[in-house]
Amino acid sequence: MERYDKATLNAAFAPEFRQNEGSLTSTLRTLLFFTALMITLPVGLYFSSKAYIFEGTLGMSNRDSYFYAAIVAVVTVHVVLAMFVYVAWSEGTRQWREGKQD
């Protein structure tokens, strides 16, 4: 049996670990970006569309503006989710293709 020291083992597994670490960092960064979008964008668009578009520009009542602003927020959530699925799918197929070429 051969004995391996730590330097030899680290040199053997370092490129694979670095590739996985980069992939994990990229995935985490994407997830955090879309999490921030999912929290801020629908809430921000809800209040801004309610105040500036529906009540301010269109002159709707307070009750009607709640309803239409909620629709804007729900549509925004669906758009952000669709964007996340597209980016995750593209990133996954890119990583799969890179793995197949090795």
Swiss-Prot record:
Residues 52-66 are lumenal. It is a multi-pass membrane protein. GO terms for biological process: vacuolar proton-transporting V-type ATPase complex assembly. One of its GO terms (cellular component) is lysosome. The chain crosses the membrane at residues 31-51, 67-87. It is found in: Endoplasmic reticulum membrane; Endoplasmic reticulum-Golgi intermediate compartment membrane; Cytoplasmic vesicle, COPII-coated vesicle membrane. The keyword Transmembrane applies. Signal peptide: none annotated. InterPro entries: Vma21. Disulfide bonds: none annotated. Residues 1-30, 88-102 are cytoplasmic. Keywords: Cytoplasmic vesicle, Endoplasmic reticulum, Membrane, Transmembrane, Transmembrane helix. The keyword Endoplasmic reticulum applies. Associates with the V0 complex of the vacuolar ATPase (V-ATPase). Interacts with ATP6AP2. Required for the assembly of the V0 complex of the vacuolar ATPase (V-ATPase) in the endoplasmic reticulum. Belongs to the VMA21 family. This is Vacuolar ATPase assembly integral membrane protein VMA21. It comes from Gallus gallus.
